[in-house]
Curated annotation (Swiss-Prot):
GO molecular function terms noted in the UniProt entry: DNA binding
NCBIfam families according to UniProt: PRK00110.1, PRK12378.1, YebC/PmpR family DNA-binding transcriptional regulator
Organism: Bacillus cereus (strain Q1)
Protein's name in the database: Probable transcriptional regulatory protein BCQ_0605
GO biological process terms held by the UniProt record: regulation of DNA-templated transcription
SUPFAM superfamilies attached to this UniProt entry: YebC-like (SSF75625)
Compartments where located: Cytoplasm
Amino acid sequence: MGRKWNNIKDKKASKDANTSRIYAKFGREIYVAAKQGEPDPESNQALRVVLERAKTYNVPRTIIDRAVEKAKGGSEENYDELRYEGFGPNGAMVIVDTLTNNVNRTAADVRAAFSKNGGNMGVNGSVAYMFDATAVIGLEGKTSDEVLEILMEADVDARDILEEEDAVIVYAEPDQFHAVQSALKDAGVEEFTVAELTMLAQNDVTLPEDAQAQFEKMVDALEDLEDVQQVYHNVDLGE
């Protein structure tokens, strides 16, 4: 599972380096979550997940408040949640999650990002079956044994608990996201280094150097698209 953590860590580092882009994407995601349910995270689990994720990226409070207020104000701006699947160089598998107010534009942009970088879009279901929806919670200051004991005492299930570098990473079912965080918060954990709902590949692949360079260019092109929220893949990007 360490390679999966490398991919999550590298992705987070990449996004941290593009703060304006990541803030804009979170603003849109917070707005959609707040508009689809109550604007209160206590009663809106989807909104609570987004806000917990936003904390790990240090999204400013002003951006969060602006998105929530926009939703509360009855904005007529609507977004569709769409997932695209495809392949990169050497058959690498890719999932692209989007929030869009123009489906035709988004589909064309995603298709172009694939095709211009050695990839191609697939049909729905062509790669998703090789990924597992997973909650990933990361923290520092405790050992994996301590985290396991905390979760067991709280009767919370986890798929795996691993020590990765200076952090402990908990992998759990998506519906256990809040339960894991709540148990850890009750045990004194105040800050999480990772709080993600992600799609983890069941098997990672390693690409030749030239193919990996092209693949990374394709992923960058996808993530640069305004409507793209998340890009998941099965390539081990290494350290």
